[in-house]
């Protein structure tokens, strides 16, 4: 467990990576632009495929973009097609979806689209959005970061809405997938979003990839049972009463009454 100067803490976890095939559309962004139940939007971008053998695949080309609900979803639906002669059209904005309550995974396929010579080039590219879940506790909010991407995220930056300025202030960073914001006020709503920073391992693939999660809000509450004290009982044979003493071994439990 890592503990930060402002009292936040987190637990370690491993990032997921995958090998890449020549001709694959290398996805670089699946970033939440708008958090909404009905009007959410996601920015998706990818790198123009490198090392493309243009002898069998001399174009024109077509990108097919698919989406599935959930960061590990498998029920893909096509949401967009892009016909191109240059392969330079490498981004879309997916709109009118529920980004507040759901994460999404995207698949991008590249086809040679010549008449009589249409075929899939390489392998599809896959990457999910960054989905943040929050669990309120006593004067705290616990978070779990969910993602399914082919690059390595080296850092997650946490931001909390400042109710005075209505801007999101940085409250800490972690390279792990759980995080706790401590020292909060019970009964007050707090809103958060996170930014991931990462990149692909191979030298010829993109670094410094930045993506954002949805906005998630939570209200801390005293929903945790008090700490169990260590109890000792002493008595004297000629006395009609017992003396009961208790103590807390965890310093954080001293005020938990």
What are these regions (language model features)?
Residues 28-33, 228-233:
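Surface-exposed, proline-enriched loop/turn segments that connect beta strands in immunoglobulin-like
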Residues 9-12, 46, 73-81, 118, ...:
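Tryptophan-centered short beta-strand motifs
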Residues 34-39, 133-137, 234-239:
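Short, solvent-exposed loop/linker segments at the N-terminal edge
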Residues 58-101, 155-187, 205-208, 256-257:
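Recognizes extended acidic, P/S/T-rich segments that occur
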